[in-house]
Amino acid sequence: MSRAVAVACTAALCAVPVVARLHAQSRWDVSFGATGAQEIVRSRVGTTRERLSGLVFSGEAVATRGRLVARLRYGQGRVTADAAGRDVVEGEALLGYKARPWLTLWVGPHARTFVVPGQSDQRWLLWSGRVTARGSLFPGRLESFVELWQGFTGSLNRPAGSAGGGGAEAGLELRLASRPFWGRLAYRIEQGRVDGGRRETVEALTLTVGYVPLR
């Protein structure tokens, strides 16, 4: 697990120069964050079911210019059951458009790899469309948000096949007055499916601490 934490911290530190460079261009608003997630993975193949849980640490970077938004996330961790475990690597690269100040439309790939000792890696790749809606609870301080997504094409490498899926995330974001830090508490659920009855459902409770340079 310490390796996953180190990777997440390294990713966040590497993002700092990029954030500073983009922020220096007045047309860009940028931020980055570090997330810890308690994940529960439920796997079903036919009548066989498996439940695993563990911690996943990730980093994210968001850049906004006018109505355009780009979001990158990458994380690593490990989920375990009584007798076995899997390393988890996940990430996404999304391009968004702010249709309204409170509504953002997204498109892009989301990938997750499960590494099981003695077996080939299992890789899910889904291209999805997403919608994020926000509501202000305390203007400029506290917001609620809901994000829904649906995959329109995808694949699983083992066993090879076409994949589909969808998910949702909801939570709260807090921004401190005259401070460059923000926080997010959220719940996320998503599911990947392939023909033959195979399903992978991932639930996560996430806590994010972020930084955005003040103008």
Predicted feature descriptions by range:
Residues M1-D29, L214-R215:
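Cleavable N-terminal export/targeting peptides
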Residues A4, L22-A24, L72-Y74, L176, ...:
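Positively charged, low-complexity intrinsically disordered regions
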Residues L22-T80, T206, G210-L214:
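Short glycine/proline- and aromatic-enriched beta-strand/turn motifs that initiate or cap beta-hairpins
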Residues L52-V56, R86-E90, W124-L126, A163-G167, ...:
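Membrane-spanning beta-strands of outer-membrane beta-barrel proteins
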Residues V56-E60, E90-L94, S128-T132, G167-G171, ...:
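Membrane-embedded beta-strand positions in outer-membrane beta-barrel channels/transporters
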Residues R67, R100-L103, R112-R199, G210-R215:
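Outer-membrane beta-barrel transmembrane domain signature
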Residues V69-K98:
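Surface-exposed loop and membrane-interface regions of Gram-negative outer-membrane beta-barrel proteins
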